[in-house]
Amino acid sequence: MFKEFKIFIMRGNVVDLAVGIVIGAAFGAIVNSLVKDVLMPPIGLLLGNVDFGNLFIVLKEGAIGGPYESLLVAQTAGAVTINYGVFINALINFLILAMAIFFFVVRPLNQLAARQKSKEAVIPAQTDKKDCPYCATQIPLKASKCPYCTSELM
C-alpha cells in the first residue's frame, strides 16, 4: 500500500500540481499586495481619500452603537456589515490574476497549439488510397481493378 502511494506521489503530474499550487499561492499574495498597497491607495486618493478596505454598510449595529470609523471598529463592536470595499479589492485581485494567467499561460499555450497544428497541416498525410481514373472514387493503392466501376487499372 505504501509502495503504491509512493508511486502515485512520484508521478510527474502530482508533483507538478503541488509546485503549481505553491507558486500560485505565492503569486496570489503578490497580486494581493499589488492591489492593496500599490493600486488602491492612488485610486482612493483620486476619489477623495477613500480607503476601499473601509467601505461598508451597517445592517445592524453592534453592542456599541455607530457610526463606526472603520470596518475594524464595526466588527469589534459586533456590527453586522456588508463589506463592499473588501469585495472591490478582491474583484480587482481576481481581474489582475485572470489577466496574468491569460497572458502568461493560456495565450502562449494556444499559440503553441496553433503552431503545432500548422506544422501538421504542412506535412502531407501518408495515404494508402488513390483515385480511380474512370469513376474518381477512392480505392486501395494496390488495387488492380476498381470495385465500383470494375475498370481494369494499370
Swiss-Prot record:
What Pfam families does this protein map onto? Answer: MscL
Which controlled-vocabulary keywords does the entry list?
A: Cell membrane, Ion channel, Ion transport, Membrane, Transmembrane, Transmembrane helix, Transport
Q: Where in the cell is it found?
A: Cell membrane
Q: Give the coiled coil ranges.
A: none
Taking the first listed entry, what is the main subcellular location of this protein, grouped into a coarse class? membrane
| Gene3D superfamilies, per the entry | Large-conductance mechanosensitive channel, MscL, domain 1
Topology term for the membrane: Multi-pass membrane protein
- Annotated transmembrane regions: 14-34, 86-106
Gene Ontology molecular function terms on file: mechanosensitive monoatomic ion channel activity
Subunit structure as annotated in this protein's UniProt entry: Homopentamer.
The record's section on PANTHER family has: LARGE-CONDUCTANCE MECHANOSENSITIVE CHANNEL, MECHANOSENSITIVE CHANNEL MSCL
Matching entries from HAMAP family are given as:
MscL
What exactly does this protein do? Channel that opens in response to stretch forces in the membrane lipid bilayer. May participate in the regulation of osmotic pressure changes within the cell.
Q: What is this protein called?
A: Large-conductance mechanosensitive channel
| Species | Dehalococcoides mccartyi (strain ATCC BAA-2100 / JCM 16839 / KCTC 5957 / BAV1)
